[in-house]
Amino acid sequence: VFTPEILDEMFDIYKQHKFFIKDKNGKEIRVEDTRHMRSLKFRECLQNYFKDKDISFNFLGDGTNRMALLIDGYVYKLALDDQGYIDNLTEFKMSREAQPYVTKTYETNGLFCVAEYVTLISYDEFVKQKMRILEILDILSSEYLLGDMGWTKKNYCNWGYRKNTKDLVILDYGHMMRVDTNKFICSECGGFLSY
């Protein structure tokens, strides 16, 4: 889908840490919200690229650290900052081992990750599926530390249904990591660490 040239351009935008806009008098003003400005620059760049290539796509929306696009039936998650980049790498790493409870992530270069498209659930559906969600979280929490996917109202949009099987899965799991019991033991005294 992406040429090496557009990937280079996207990486240049990603690496940019200073953004300026012009006020009504033409004076340049530095914008502090680099994540938001990066999102706007990415959108502009991608719209032009897809128009030139005659590729249909949809912007699915922005999250805290990534934006999502739907291209040819796949979700492309684009990192808006360093945490989004790490989230893409994490999801690629965790995807295979956390099946069937998370969306499949097929590939990543850090900036983008390509993932399975699932149907987002509504808040009402989230409430109806409470027992199944808690069951999935309980299964995963036996081996993983889970972030940003628990049973709270703000996390309902991190869940969806697989298209073919209608299985309930987590679609944003960039803050998930395997439990490493060595990290709970002090390397100096051997005592238990609490966080």
Question: What is the predicted function of each stretch?
Answer:
Residues 3, 10, 47-55, 59, ...:
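Intrinsically disordered, compositionally biased low-complexity regions
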Residues 69-73, 117, 162-163:
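Active-site beta-strand termini and strand-to-loop segments that position acidic
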Residues 149-195:
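Catalytic activation segment of kinase domains across protein kinase-like and atypical kinase folds
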Residues 80, 96-137:
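Conserved structural core of kinase catalytic domains
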Residues 2, 6-72, 81:
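ATP-binding glycine-rich phosphate-binding loop
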Residues 64, 108, 153-157:
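Short, surface-exposed coil-to-beta transition loops
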Residues 142-150:
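Protein kinase catalytic-loop region centered on the HRD/HxD motif
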Residues 54-103, 110:
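ATP-binding glycine-rich loop module of kinase domains
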